[in-house]
Curated annotation (Swiss-Prot):
GO cellular component, one term: cytoplasm
Originating gene: pfdA
Keywords: Chaperone, Cytoplasm
Keyword Cytoplasm: yes
UniProt xrefs under InterPro entries: PFD_alpha_archaea, Prefoldin, Prefoldin_subunit_alpha
Family, as annotated: Belongs to the prefoldin alpha subunit family.
Protein name: Prefoldin subunit alpha
Protein source organism: Halorubrum lacusprofundi (strain ATCC 49239 / DSM 5036 / JCM 8891 / ACAM 34)
Amino acid sequence: MMGGGQQQLQQLSQELQALDEEIEALEVEIDDHREEQSDIDDAIEAIETLDSGSTVQVPLGGGAYVRAEVQDIDEIIVSLGGNYSAEQSEEDAIDVLGRKRDALDDRIEETQEEVDELESESQELEQQAQQMQQQMQQQQMQQMQQSQGDEE
């Protein structure tokens, strides 16, 4: 019976490890969404404070930037997703970005709920594993006591 208990305990341990990995991946996803939200907030702030004639740094990639003068703030090019972009007025651009931020809020909330469920499941499995270990220890103690009693 002890062999079967060890096997069940090992299976629980593997399930716990898989749950922990899944939780970690979801938490990374949440962090990515929060970073994306921060980028959106920065973009909205830049749109609201930018004026024609302002000098900005334009990223070229690889950590390289070039300074450029903003010539026209009337139309802002906004990514719509799926490699599509569109020119938008300042107000419309802020609206599009706000909706993206709201969608990220929803995704974060859904993902956090999933994390919470998995953490709850993980706690239940940990409790089961602890109970199994205690039972196995008690059985070992009883067997030791019996064998000592048999020797006397």
